[in-house]
Amino acid sequence: MAQQYQPGQRWISDSEAELGLGTILAQDGRLLTVLYPATGDTRQYSLRNAPLTRVRFSPGDQITHFEGWKLTVREVEDIDGLMVYHGLDGQNQPRTLPETQLSNFIQFRLASDRLFAGQIDPLSWFSLRYNTLQHTSKQMQSALWGLGGCRAQPIAHQLHIAREVADRSAPRVLLADEVGLGKTIEAGLVIHRQLLSGRASRVLILVPENLQHQWLVEMRRRFNLQVALFDAERFIESDASNPFEDAQLALVALEWLVDDEKAQDALFAAGWDLMVVDEAHHLVWHEDQVSAEYGLVEQLAQVIPGVLLLTATPEQLGQDSHFARLRLLDPNRFHDLAAFRAESEHYRPVAEAVQELLDEGRLSPKAHATILGFLGAEGEALLAAVSDGDTQASARLIRELLDRHGTGRVLFRNTRAAIQGFPERQLHPYPLATPEQYRNLPAGEHAELYPEVAFQAQGEVADDERWWRFDPRVDWLIDTLKMLKRTKVLVICAHAETAMDLEDALRVRSGIPASVFHEGMSILERDRAAAYFADEEFGAQVLICSEIGSEGRNFQFAHHLVMFDLPAHPDLLEQRIGRLDRIGQKHTIQLHIPYLQDSPQERLFQWYHEGLNAFLNTCPTGNALQHQFGPRLLPLLEGGDHKAWDTLVADARSERERLEAELHTGRDRLLELNSGGAGEGQALVEAILEQDDQFALPIYMETLFDAFGIDSEDHSENALILKPSEKMLDASFPLGDDEGVTITYDRGQALSREDMQFLTWEHPMVQGGMDLVLSGSMGNTAVALIKNKALKPGTVLLELLFVSEVVAPRSLQLGRYLPPAALRCLLDANGNDLASRVAFETLNDQLESVPRASANKFVQAQRDVLAKRISGGEEKILPAHNERVAEAQRRLTAEADEELARLVALQAVNPSVRDSEIDALRKRREDGLAMLEKAALRLEAIRVLVAG
């Protein structure tokens, strides 16, 4: 018979028990809407298979009114599908409690209900449930939660920034690291940690259109975040009243958004917790006028609590542009450009004094006076200790100065000069004769820098006349690859057509195995191409990438880069080199540059090498120089006056050297120290590497796969193939692919093989599998035979697992203070608790399975005795529960009070600490304590043990 639903009825979710009691709001066609008042969540379910259990209490049960008073049920009445409970309250007075007024925090003894209903699970499932509780508890309390699961080498400055920013309530910061230091990874880590902690649940990412794919790949590959990419086509085709409301993470191109007012209205109406804006330095602002893009981001920043701006370094931008970014974050704090300039000058002598302390290990009288003037009387004792050579005092002094830094809490900027671990670069130019076929091509951009594209565009040619038959760069490439033999080589060219033609050329003319990679391929096809290139034993020697196709991909296991042509902008040149030139690259980068002599290619090579020095070093001034000299550069690229060309290159070189000298003298070491984490990030790196070396996850996942009927077989070293078996328990297990997937637990393997899933405690497959165990009833009952000579045959032991459970919004992060670790009780016939004397694993090794029919028969025969013991077990464990809750309250209070005191003290000396941040922390503390006060003891699982 179909289930009858009525508004006001109380139900509990089988898959999300932590939501508390649900109330039926409406039944509309085939959809059922349920409100969970405890957390404020609303869910919609299909009527046919809603994962809900009706809440019904029986005479003898004790229930709670939402105002807190309790009722012992005597009689249950059904009035038009709604339950009305009659009974006695705490003063033994008769009262009535309609189910609509039940407390939203009531817990259920589902384990005992299942045991007595004969629903007894396999013995291994009980162990799986226990271990899942323990692992969940450990991860919830881990300082690495949200940081260790990224598919990247753990890098100190990135981890420091991610933890510092993500642990704030509604962070509003500027990430302005130099190129190659991983701003996108930093932003991804912040997003990931904020989502896992519940501090954010809806994230908007605004990027330039040409970076959409790069962000999509990075978020999916590195963080397993399923981002919805929005453009005009998707927005128009959506049937939803507001397409943005369906996406937890939305990736939107700013160019489209500015031109579409309807999309803007929908975006504002959707509501977001965190906004990330990439390339924020392209948002144009002047005191008397702002661009449409800047205005739109400014409006969004006024209504979205958290804002992350990713931008070029302040030195590249200039002070006015830098002020414009800070103004987006906190318009009250940064409201006056002149005042900002004056404040910046005020901090410069302090930064120089810190530089002196770091370089010399002591302070000159001038530096001493500067810092004393900045800190005031409270700095005297600290400065005296520094003068006496106290290194700890030096560290404390730097921390005091960091806290007072004008933009230290809102701006993070790391430089290559401050970060170790980058490889050297070596340049190998190869001038080649220009073939006759290229000398009379029609004028245009392609003819100048990419003659092969212009040649192909003239029309169809015979196979033996294709451009790669006569272009000397192709002969050179084949010879170079043969010389390098099995060495991995990355080839990048500007256009997809060139990449595909080069693959043909290598196959036809040399037989060298090559993989191709361009924007016309799907993400899956690119994954396969990258995996074929990465395979050391059977893979391709060379990967040929187009400019756009290679965005967002890093191949740092290779160190030879061939630029078959040169890009038109120095930023793109740096992006190409950045595919290999990353922190963690173990070899010197070998840059191979073939170019055609007496052509625009030769002059562009000279411009980049002699003018910008962009091959051997990163070029933070490249964009400014290209903009400044562009009007002279473009006409001269085509040829003409050699003297004018030499003058241009010399002028660019002089201007570059001047700008670089300015950058060096303007380095703010105080800000670099704060951004780098002053050692804190390195501790996180070591903790993550230590966690990587542990075997707890592979051991646990093997038991999880076994329980759910997932077959695993060896793929290669450190890799497994997972496939659903015929006995797969639950089709909703998050395998990721019905056909099967390849996984690895090894970070190094995952970095070189992007076609493999990198399993960590944070991976959706791991988290989803654990949720399936704990959100349902799997393993919450078991009956076993215990083989122990010390026990008389027939002796019955009862093992009970309890959990201290608090129903609260995830954003409060109460799991950190009251995690779902099992409170274990092992009762003998006399009611004695033996758990402290017999460890779980010790007991587990002595157990044997019992056929379900026999187990059920025994349970039914002992029902009254077992029910009494279960009740007694709850009484025994209650003091431990109360102490655990009290300890959680103490920890939350101590942690929140310490952070509050720090922020209040900080605000007195640094106006970048917002009132809203302090108020939010106070509210979180009060809400958290109130929710912990309602924490209940829940019976999680029962195991009946019979001595044999």
From Swiss-Prot:
<dbReference type="GO" id="GO:0003677">
    <property type="term" value="F:DNA binding"/>
</dbReference>
<dbReference type="InterPro" id="IPR001650">
    <property type="entry name" value="Helicase_C-like"/>
</dbReference>
<dbReference type="InterPro" id="IPR027417">
    <property type="entry name" value="P-loop_NTPase"/>
</dbReference>
<keyword id="KW-0547">Nucleotide-binding</keyword>
<dbReference type="InterPro" id="IPR014001">
    <property type="entry name" value="Helicase_ATP-bd"/>
</dbReference>
<keyword id="KW-0347">Helicase</keyword>
<keyword id="KW-0010">Activator</keyword>
<feature type="domain" description="Helicase ATP-binding">
    <location>
        <begin position="164"/>
        <end position="332"/>
    </location>
</feature>
<keyword id="KW-0067">ATP-binding</keyword>
<keyword id="KW-0238">DNA-binding</keyword>
<feature type="short sequence motif" description="DEAH box">
    <location>
        <begin position="278"/>
        <end position="281"/>
    </location>
</feature>
<dbReference type="InterPro" id="IPR023949">
    <property type="entry name" value="Helicase_RapA"/>
</dbReference>
<dbReference type="GO" id="GO:0006355">
    <property type="term" value="P:regulation of DNA-templated transcription"/>
</dbReference>
<feature type="domain" description="Helicase C-terminal">
    <location>
        <begin position="473"/>
        <end position="627"/>
    </location>
</feature>
<comment type="subunit">
    <text>Interacts with the RNAP. Has a higher affinity for the core RNAP than for the holoenzyme. Its ATPase activity is stimulated by binding to RNAP.</text>
</comment>
<dbReference type="InterPro" id="IPR000330">
    <property type="entry name" value="SNF2_N"/>
</dbReference>
<dbReference type="GO" id="GO:0004386">
    <property type="term" value="F:helicase activity"/>
</dbReference>
<dbReference type="GO" id="GO:0016817">
    <property type="term" value="F:hydrolase activity, acting on acid anhydrides"/>
</dbReference>
<dbReference type="Pfam" id="PF00176">
    <property type="entry name" value="SNF2-rel_dom"/>
</dbReference>
<dbReference type="InterPro" id="IPR038718">
    <property type="entry name" value="SNF2-like_sf"/>
</dbReference>
<keyword id="KW-0378">Hydrolase</keyword>
<dbReference type="Pfam" id="PF18337">
    <property type="entry name" value="Tudor_RapA"/>
</dbReference>
<comment type="function">
    <text>Transcription regulator that activates transcription by stimulating RNA polymerase (RNAP) recycling in case of stress conditions such as supercoiled DNA or high salt concentrations. Probably acts by releasing the RNAP, when it is trapped or immobilized on tightly supercoiled DNA. Does not activate transcription on linear DNA. Probably not involved in DNA repair.</text>
</comment>
<comment type="similarity">
    <text>Belongs to the SNF2/RAD54 helicase family. RapA subfamily.</text>
</comment>
<dbReference type="InterPro" id="IPR022737">
    <property type="entry name" value="RapA_C"/>
</dbReference>
<protein>
    <recommendedName>
        <fullName>RNA polymerase-associated protein RapA</fullName>
        <ecNumber>3.6.4.-</ecNumber>
    </recommendedName>
</protein>
<dbReference type="InterPro" id="IPR040766">
    <property type="entry name" value="Tudor_2_RapA"/>
</dbReference>
<dbReference type="Pfam" id="PF18339">
    <property type="entry name" value="Tudor_1_RapA"/>
</dbReference>
<dbReference type="Pfam" id="PF12137">
    <property type="entry name" value="RapA_C"/>
</dbReference>
<dbReference type="InterPro" id="IPR040765">
    <property type="entry name" value="Tudor_1_RapA"/>
</dbReference>
<dbReference type="Pfam" id="PF00271">
    <property type="entry name" value="Helicase_C"/>
</dbReference>
<dbReference type="GO" id="GO:0005524">
    <property type="term" value="F:ATP binding"/>
</dbReference>
<dbReference type="InterPro" id="IPR049730">
    <property type="entry name" value="SNF2/RAD54-like_C"/>
</dbReference>
<keyword id="KW-0804">Transcription</keyword>
<keyword id="KW-0805">Transcription regulation</keyword>
<feature type="binding site">
    <location>
        <begin position="177"/>
        <end position="184"/>
    </location>
    <ligand>
        <name>ATP</name>
    </ligand>
</feature>
